[in-house]
Structures are given as structure tokens and as C-alpha cells.
Amino acid sequence: MEKFLNLPIEKKKTIIDAALKSFGTNGYKKTSVSDIAAAAGISKAMVFHYFGTKKALYFYL
């Protein structure tokens, strides 16, 4: 997560907004990391690079 915290604010906001929208619309179980990555305009690998797991991203929110 430290890598995520070192990102520029706009990039962090884009990822967080995408995650909030996906989780809010589909719920935790039906949201995939691929959905979040696509909405944020980054690769799925980068989401895992920043957070490690979907659960870690969810708890960050």
C-alpha cells in the first residue's frame, strides 16, 4: 500500500473513485479487480501492485 500512498493525488483519486463506484454498484463479491482497473484506466497488475489484494483495497476505502 505504501506504493499507492506515494502516487500523485489525481492518480489516487482516479483509482479510489473507480473502486467506490464499482463496489457501490456491484457489491464486494461481484466487483472484480479487472472492473476497477478498467474504470481507473490502469492494468489489473497495477491494482495488485498498489494494494496486494481486492480485500486490502476494500478495507482502505
What is the predicted role of each segment?
Residues 42-51:
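Short hydrophobic/aromatic patch on the recognition helix
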Residues 1-26, 31-42, 56:
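Basic, helix-initiating cap at the start of DNA-binding domains
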Residues 59-61:
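Alpha-helical DNA-contacting segments of helix-turn-helix folds
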